[in-house]
Amino acid sequence: MATAEKPVLTRYKDRMDKAVLSLKEDFAGLRTGRASSGLLDQIMVNAYGSMVQLNTVASISVPEPRQINVNIWDKGVVSAVEKAIRNSDLGLNPVVEGNNLRIPIPPLTEERRKDLVKIAGKYAEAQKVAVRNIRRDANDDLKKAEKASVISEDELKKMETEVQKITDGAIKQVDEALKTKEQEIMQV
């Protein structure tokens, strides 16, 4: 039975790791006082008759701490890219310079910083719920295996303890990521 328990638990650990990774991707899209190419990752552009991610029609660079440059490959989608960035809830105003957009990053107000911290907290809580749901799935599967006599009651308890350790580790990673992001947002 020892060989059968590892794949089961690693499958759930992988799912929890993906939840933590998803949180970090969500955090990359939250604006802080500094410029970051990840800030524009979630922006969708209406180009060529469909919605595509910004990075499929342009390259994004950060030449200065408070500026993002977007080099658009096709002049025909410059206005669509500008409109998508302007209409995003990031509060950015791009300046068109030929095929390039220069996006100055204004400093955040104290009120906006607090709003962003709340949003980050909501993202983190959503991922904690996802991790707990994965734990529930794992425990349900373990109980089914015990009921079907695939594992013994002792193995069930041992594996449930292991699932809880994995869950605690994932929750700790979420909390650490949130703390780091909050500090980054509140940094003036």
Curated annotation (Swiss-Prot):
The keyword GTP-binding does not apply. The keyword Coiled coil does not apply. It comes from the Bacteria. This is Ribosome-recycling factor. It is found in: Cytoplasm. CDD domains: RRF. Belongs to the RRF family. Gene3D superfamilies: 3.30.1360.40, Ribosome-recycling factor (1.10.132.20). Responsible for the release of ribosomes from messenger RNA at the termination of protein biosynthesis. May increase the efficiency of translation by recycling ribosomes from one round of translation to another.
